[in-house]
Every structure is written in C-alpha cells, then in structure tokens.
C-alpha cells in the first residue's frame, strides 16, 4: 500500500511539470508562426507606395549675376508591385520636372513619368526588363538615386552623358529609355553578395518617352565585378545611331558636311569606374566617361568627363569632398568646360530624413572666361530630403 501511495504522489508531482512544458511549447509555436488576418493578407498583395520630397534653398553667384531662391527640387512617387510570383513592376513619377522646354506655358514645373517597366525574374542569373527604365550607364544613373546620393546633385557624367542625347534630346533629362534589358547576378560568394552582374539592353535611344525616329536601336553592354563585399568595378559601353532633332529645350547636334543626311548619326558612349563603400566608414568613388560621334570624317560630338568623391560615414554625419571636370571639345567656350570642387556634409537625424549642405566652386579657363565674362562660379545648396 505504501508503495502504491508513493507512486501516486510521484505521478501527481510530475504531471504539472509535463503539462506546463507542453503548454510552453505550444505557446512558443504559436508565437513563432502568427497567422495573418484577412486584411493583412490583402495588404501584403497590394502595391507598395513610397517616394520622397527634396526641397530647400539654392544660391549662385559669379561676377555677372547672383541668385537666391527656395527650390522645389524633386518630388518622386514610386509604386512597386508584383504581377505574379516572378513578375514585378515599377512606376516612378517626378512631380517637380523643371527640364528646359518641358515646363508649362507659365514656366512652372510639371509631371514626368520616369520609370514604367515590368521585370520577369525566373533566376537570379537571368532577368528580363521591358518598358521605360534607367539605362546602366555609370553608377550614378543606375546604382544610386537622389535619395541615396552623397551630394545634392550628380556629376556631369550623369547629366550630360547618361541623361542627354546631343542629337535627339540636347538637354538634360532623367537617363531613361524605352526598350528591353537582360540582366543577372552570378557567382555566389557565400557572404551575401554575387561576384558578377551584367546588363545587356536594346533601346530606342531618344531617352524620353518617345517613339524611335529611325530603325536603328541603341545597344548597352555593362558589367560589374565585385571581388569583395564593399568594392566593385563597373564598365558600360553604349552605341547608337540618331537623328538630329530640334526641340524647344535644345537644338540637336548636326553634321555640316555636304550630303550628310543627319538621320543615322553614329555615336558611342563609355563610362568606367570603381567604388568602395563601407556603410560604417569610408566611401570612395570615381568614374571617367567619354562621348564621341564622327559623321563623314567630321567630329560632331566629342566630350569627356570625370569625378572623384571621398566621404566618411560617421554615425548620423557624412562629410564629403568631390572633384569633377567636364570638357566639350566641339563647344570649347561653353560653361560646360570646367573644373569644380564640392565640399559638403549631410546630417541624417532619422532614417527617412537627410539634410545635405553643399558648397561648389566651378573654375573656368581663359577662353571660357572671355566668353562668359567670369572665371569662377559659386553655389550653395541647403536641402532637406524626406522619404515616405
């Protein structure tokens, strides 16, 4: 009888602990896999809306003129969504488009469609993009956006090479084009990055949202090699044939040789660069680019550009210094022939807010000084960028 009572007491002592363990395991499982509500499931399938506003103050000064103005610089609305398990789309709209020739009749900025493309991604190594998208010409046109750029403005490699076509669109646009692009990432490092990325694109070549003016198509060949995590080397080559076009914002380049039809003018662009960026340390990037066109032996386009940027991520602060230059050998007396030094610092108090302060000094040679009436140009930019 004593043995029986002892067994009963032992069983009663063990049962609560076993039951408690089972309850704890069940609760842990419930916490690890919470079930989505119907509303959450619907929201998860809806397109994601994001964007940013960049606004602030801009001051410029030279020996002939001075300006001071608050600016509505950029207002981007971005919509990302999924058409299926392997097909996504993006729509990006710029609501403060102030490009010369594209403002309304009163000189006000208007709305411009920037991105409108779909991407099919069956594999990491092979993806197809179709629609209007950013071309892979240089880091600042495809790997960086105004929201992630270390300064307020890009270098002229972007503005005058990637965002401009001297023949068909001789003013600065947004570096987009209509066409199809094949891309992919290969060579898994096992450390969270791939060793090689490629882009191969066929586009109209006119840059903005326009049909092609001839039967020829632009070709882009781009490769990025990443030997280790924070460093990569990129090179992009572009070739196309273009029609000389006159627009409200700028007259296209044209050959003066007798008999030149100016409908299939060949032009090449090339940009190469290297970038090391430690999110908690130093940021170093440099690029060199050129753009050439020759028609019946005549040089119609011959431009060169380069920049070097050094910055340091110090918590909420990012101080930078950038040198950049540009040379237009066809128009040697224009303000696009310069050397420029930029000093800047960006304060980021929270993840979605950036406040960059930039000072830029542009220097011109004697020939440009004679044409412009001044040999240097100052600029101060204080901007706030607010993401949502």
Feature map (PLM): residue ranges:
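N-terminal periplasmic/intermembrane-space "pro-region" immediately following the signal or transit peptide
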Residues: 4-54, 59, 388
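Alpha-helical transmembrane segments and their juxtamembrane interfaces
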Residues: 12-13, 95, 139, 297
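Residues in and immediately flanking transmembrane alpha helices
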Residues: 15-16, 98, 145, 364
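Outer-membrane beta-barrel pore domains
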Residues: 23-27, 42, 61-65, 84, ...
């Amino acid at each position: 009888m004593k043995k029986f009572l002892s067994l009963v007491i032992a069983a009663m002592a063990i049962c609560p602990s076993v039951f408690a363990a089972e309850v704890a395991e069940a609760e842990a499982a419930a916490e690890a896999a919470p079930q989505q509500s119907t509303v959450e499931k619907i929201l998860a399938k809806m397109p994601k809306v994001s964007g940013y506003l960049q606004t602030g103050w801009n001051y410029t000064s030279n020996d002939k003129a001075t300006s001071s103005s608050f600016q509505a610089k950029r207002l981007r609305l971005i919509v990302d969504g999924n058409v299926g398990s392997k097909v996504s789309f993006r729509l990006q709209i710029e609501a403060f488009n102030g490009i010369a020739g594209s403002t309304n009749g009163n000189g006000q900025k208007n709305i411009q469609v920037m991105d409108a493309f779909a991407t099919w991604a069956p594999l990491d190594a092979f993806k197809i993009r179709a629609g209007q998208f950013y071309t892979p010409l240089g880091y600042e046109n495809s790997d960086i956006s105004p929201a992630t750029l270390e300064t307020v403005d890009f270098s002229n490699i972007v503005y005058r090479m990637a965002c401009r076509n001297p023949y068909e669109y001789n003013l600065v646009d947004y570096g987009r084009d209509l066409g199809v692009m094949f891309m992919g990432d290969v060579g898994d490092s096992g450390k969270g990055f791939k060793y090689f990325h490629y882009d191969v694109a066929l586009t109209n070549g006119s840059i903005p949202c326009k049909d092609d003016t001839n039967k020829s198509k632009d070709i882009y060949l781009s490769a990025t090699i990443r030997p280790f995590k924070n460093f990569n080397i990129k090179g992009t080559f572009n070739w196309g044939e273009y029609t000389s076009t006159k627009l409200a914002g700028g007259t296209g380049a044209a050959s003066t040789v007798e008999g030149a039809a100016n409908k299939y003018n060949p032009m090449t662009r090339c940009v190469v660069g290297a970038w090391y960026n430690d999110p908690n340390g130093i940021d170093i990037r440099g690029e060199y680019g050129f753009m050439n066109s020759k028609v019946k032996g005549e040089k119609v386009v011959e431009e060169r550009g380069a920049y070097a940027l050094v910055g340091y991520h110090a918590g909420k602060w990012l101080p930078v210094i950038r040198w950049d230059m540009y040379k237009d050998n066809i128009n040697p007396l224009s303000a696009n022939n310069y050397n420029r030094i930029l000093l800047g610092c960006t304060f980021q108090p929270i993840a979605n807010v950036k406040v960059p302060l930039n000072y830029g000094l542009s220097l011109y040679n004697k020939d440009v000084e004679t044409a412009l009436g001044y040999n240097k140009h100052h600029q101060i930019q204080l901007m706030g960028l607010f993401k949502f």
